[in-house]
A protein has these predicted regions:
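Hydrophobic transmembrane alpha-helices and immediately adjacent juxtamembrane helices
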Residues: 1-237
């Protein structure tokens, strides 16, 4: 079991290193996003947050769907836990996994360039809240899905595109005006932009606005997840 957890945590770290080596090597001398900040340095916070988001989502969604399919979810439901406690347990576990993977990605990639920490409190705030958002989204997906194919569709058609189009590899100011407008409707963009602000002190939008959007999105998805748990949607009926 320990080796399985280690493998699941190591895989996203290796993926992030590959992204950094390929994009950083190819575009380092051709892309300048912020003054005095190299493209490789710009990439690292985005890759850290991308890994954190994807693994926070995977932790709750895969745990829940696996329990539903194998039939052992009944033992969780029989425990004297309220829907609030159920929600907190799954989301806190997602936060922990997301932070562990994110830290692993950072430690593996920070050797490629010099990274600064302008505002560590912003880094921590966006990491925690964003992991909670994806943990709650994972709960929604895990409750809704009846099989792994449905969960994969949710991840492939929503989580992955929203993450990849959130400014991990670019600043939205480099996009045409139409796509800049579209990007502002993507809550994942505010997670990554605010997280990156904590490292460099510069961002595409105000970190306070990003924080308000991310908090609002958490209240939305958290409310939906709690409602699904309270009514027993696809869990008790």
């Amino acid at each position: 079991e320990f080796r399985r957890v280690l493998f699941r945590s190591a895989a996203p770290v290796l993926t992030a290193i590959l992204y950094l080596m390929i994009f950083g090597h190819v575009l380092e001398d051709h892309v300048k996003v912020y003054q005095t900040i190299s493209y490789t340095a710009f990439l690292i916070p985005g890759l850290v947050m991308m890994s954190l988001l994807q693994n926070s989502f995977a932790n709750t969604s895969s745990s829940l769907i696996q329990s539903k399919i194998t039939g052992n979810l009944i033992f969780v439901l029989l425990a004297p836990l309220s829907h609030m406690e159920f929600f907190a347990a799954y989301v806190l576990a997602a936060i922990l996994r997301g932070l562990v993977v994110g830290l692993g990605v950072f430690l593996a990639t920070c050797w490629f360039t010099t990274i600064t920490f302008q505002f560590p409190i912003w880094i921590l705030a966006f990491a925690l809240i964003s992991a909670a958002v994806l943990g709650a989204l994972g709960l929604i997906a895990g409750i809704w899905a009846d099989k792994f194919d449905q969960l994969a569709a949710f991840q492939n058609f929503f989580i992955m595109p929203a993450t990849m189009l959130s400014g991990v590899f670019y600043s939205i100011h480099t996009l045409p005006s139409v796509w800049q407008t579209v990007s502002h409707f993507n809550p994942f963009f505010y997670m990554i932009d605010g997280f990156r602000f904590g490292f460099f002190g510069v961002s595409d939008v105000s970190p306070w606005f990003s924080l308000s959007v991310v908090l609002g999105f958490f209240l939305l998805v958290g409310g939906v997840a709690l409602r699904m748990l309270a009514t027993g949607y696809k869990l008790r009926y």
